[in-house]
Each structure stands twice: as structure tokens, then as C-alpha cells.
Amino acid sequence: MLFAGFDAGQTRTRCRISRWTADGWMTVCEGQGAGVCHLDAPNGAARFRAAVGSSLKAALGQRDALELDAAVIGASGIEQGTELQHRAGDLIAQELLMPPDQVLATGDERTALHGAFPDSPGIVLISGTGMICIGRNDRGEEARSGGWGWLLDGAGAAFDLGHQGLQLSLRMADGRLPDHPLRQRLWKAMHCHSSAQVKAMVVNPDFGAAGFAALAPLVVTAAEEGLVEASHILRRSAHALT
């Protein structure tokens, strides 16, 4: 049995192809490609298929195409039991040229939970581009908290760190806060030279949550260097996850 698993976040998508053997699962190949966005967002369906296709291509490398027996994608923004989940399943089936009954699309939080705790109670807290917490009790009942999209519920995620860091940079540029190398680093990463350029950049549809999240490491570095305001951002984010 040849199985493809996809972990699709808003920043990148990872693909791993595994073969079932007498000794269990053996990894055949793996790679990563583009990230996804919400299916109802502009070009959402096209980006979803591109994420699957690009990560599969990266995993295969120079290999010939493999005939898959099953595929599962855990993707950011897929809500269990919704019409959106069915659409995502149809899209992965189309992209992989597989029958719909051989593929499954679900939320990445659920694949993480079942991967970490296949047959036991447990809790998974994900803080990536976005954030979500999901758990299962000893009766098999599952519950989730958070994960309602970066526009509504990003506290504790990389998106939120980058977003708040940019807010700091604008206050620095205005003179409302003392200037700090964080501002220059953030703007350099965005190829911006002014507050007006930053404002224009963040409303670009291609920037989105992943654009903010990519700036998060710079905020963490500034906190490690002693910037009090950056440290406050990290503490607020950590508290939001508890």
C-alpha cells in the first residue's frame, strides 16, 4: 500500500509518501511546496490544488509518478463535517487523479492529534502561522478551542507576533516610540522604505497571514536583545495560548 500524507499550512505544505511493509510504514520520499489559504478566499481552490501539486512534485523529485492507494491532507481552515471539507476532498482527488473514496481532507489539527495520540487521550496545541487547540478524552470525544482564522483569532500565533511587531515599527517611525533596529529589519524583510509602503504592502492579497508570520522571528530576536515592547508581545502571546 502506497500512501501520501499532506500537512498543509498557510506558509507551506509538506508531503510524505510512505509504503506499508511487514515492519510498518516506510518513508519513500518527502518534500514541501506552497501553502494554502481558505478555500473561499480569492483563488482559494487554485492555491489548494497548487499546494498539493507542488509538494507532491517536490517529494517525487526525479522519480517517476507513483500510483497511490490513498491520500490524506490535513489543511489549515478545513472544518470537520462541513461543505468545505467535501470541496477540499474533491480538489485533492482531482489534483492527484484519484477516486474520491480514496482520499480524505480534514483540518491539520485533527491529523496532528491522531498522529500524536492514535488510540489514547491527548491534547495538541498548534502555534504556527495560526493557532488552534484540540483534544480527545478517554471516551473518544473530541473538542477544539481557537483556530477561527487569522482575521478573528490569531492570538499566540506567528501571524500575531509579526502583526504586532509591524505595529511597533510604525509607532517607531512616527516618533511615538524610540527607534530600534527591529523597525529596519522588518522593513528590510518587506522591501519597504517608508510607513506608506508598509501600509500598501499589508493590504496586498498575496501578503496575508503568511506575510505577517514570516516576520515573527525578527520580533523574537528583538525580545532576546532586550527590546521591552517585543518582550511584552511574546508574553501576551504565550498567555493567550494557556
Sequence positions of predicted segments:
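Short glycine-aspartate micro-motif
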Residues: 3-7, 68-72, 122-126, 133
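Short beta-strand scaffold segments in enzyme catalytic cores
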Residues: 13-19, 114, 125, 131-136
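Short beta-strand-loop/turn "lid" adjacent to the catalytic site in phosphate-handling enzymes
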Residues: 37-40, 56-95, 105, 114-117
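Adenine-nucleotide phosphate-binding core of ATP-dependent small-molecule kinases
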Residues: 45-47, 51, 191-242
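Short glycine-rich, Thr/Ser-proximal phosphate-binding strand/loop in the N-terminal lobe
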Residues: 2-47, 66-67, 141-143, 147
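Conserved phosphate-binding catalytic cores of ATP/NTP-utilizing and phosphoryl-transfer enzymes
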Residues: 100-124, 141
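Acidic-glycine-rich active-site phosphate/pyrophosphate-binding loop
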Residues: 131-145, 213-216
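Glycine-rich phosphate-binding loop plus the immediately following alpha-helix
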Residues: 40, 141-192
